[in-house]
Regions:
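Short glycine/serine/threonine-rich phosphate/pyrophosphate-binding segments
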Residues: 22-26, 106-110, 131-133, 154-156
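A general structural motif
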Residues: 79-82, 99-107, 127-130
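Glycine-rich phosphate/diphosphate-binding loop of Rossmann-like nucleotide-binding domains
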Residues: 2-92
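General beta-strand structural signal in soluble alpha/beta enzymes
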Residues: 16, 39-42, 84, 99-100, ...
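Adenosine-phosphate binding glycine-rich loop
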Residues: 2, 116-217
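Rossmann-fold NAD(P) dinucleotide-binding segment
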Residues: 85-95, 105-122
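Short glycine/threonine-rich loop-to-helix capping motif typified by GTGT followed
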Residues: 21-30, 112-113, 136-137, 207
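Conserved functional loop/turn residues at catalytic and ligand-binding sites
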Residues: 34, 102, 119
């Protein structure tokens, strides 16, 4: 999405909502691409590193979360720069991109407006249906980028399909192919730039075509 606009993840300050395996895997990838993950959260609250989480600081988060029942608040013991606050104050933090990786319907219309007001350029779902229908309407109205779970979670399906034969390059090629298919489908059906609509339409067409091939339609 950023590449289509002549941009990249390099230097982008990224708010991660969640602290589970997906959230930490997202942070690892963001660091790899030169982005700066600045938050993690769980039921107890959120931790905020103003200068971002380095690989070393991410290892500390992993160690904490791998302990049964451990909460993120413990992280501030190991960092002189981190801040810990209640979940509702998380959206007060300015960011370039937001990656919700927690519960369904975490991001509603109020949350999207709050993020946009702080300069957020887009939301990329790391979990299923993190953005509510009302939130999606505000995303479109305010012109923010939106990476829906129907696109972002395809990598997991590809890995399962390829099995042990999967490698990073093949995964990257497949993800790019799916992204372009979704983008082109959205454009074809008069929904240019709407990856949520494009992915749903593309999925429907694929199922319909298979049914027709088998004489079910």
């Amino acid at each position: 999405m950023l590449a289509d606009k002549g941009d990249s993840l390099q230097g982008k300050r990224c708010m991660i909502i969640g602290g589970g395996k997906i959230a930490r895997a997202v942070a690892e990838k963001l660091i790899e691409y030169g982005a700066i993950p600045i938050t993690f959260s769980d039921a107890s609250g959120h931790v905020y590193e103003p200068a971002g989480f380095s690989e070393g600081k991410l290892k500390v988060i992993n160690q904490i979360k791998n302990e049964r029942g451990a909460l993120l608040g413990r992280y501030i013991i190991s960092s002189a720069t981190a801040e810990f606050n209640t979940p509702e104050h998380m959206l007060d933090i300015p960011c370039d991109l937001c990656f919700p990786c927690g519960a369904m319907n975490d991001i509603d219309d109020v949350a999207v407006n709050a993020l946009a007001d702080k300069g957020c350029q887009g939301i990329v779902e790391g979990g299923h249906n993190c953005v509510t229908p009302g939130g999606r309407k505000v995303l479109k109205k305010r012109g923010l980028l939106y990476g829906p779970h129907t696109c972002t979670l395809t990598g997991n399906a590809i890995v399962h399909a390829l099995g042990e034969a999967a490698n990073d390059e093949e995964l990257k090629q497949n993800v790019h192919r799916i992204y372009n298919d979704v983008k082109d489908t959205a454009r074809e059906f008069n929904a240019r730039g709407d990856l949520f609509a494009g992915s749903n339409i593309a999925g429907f067409l694929r199922v319909a075509n298979v049914m027709m091939m088998h004489g079910a339609v």
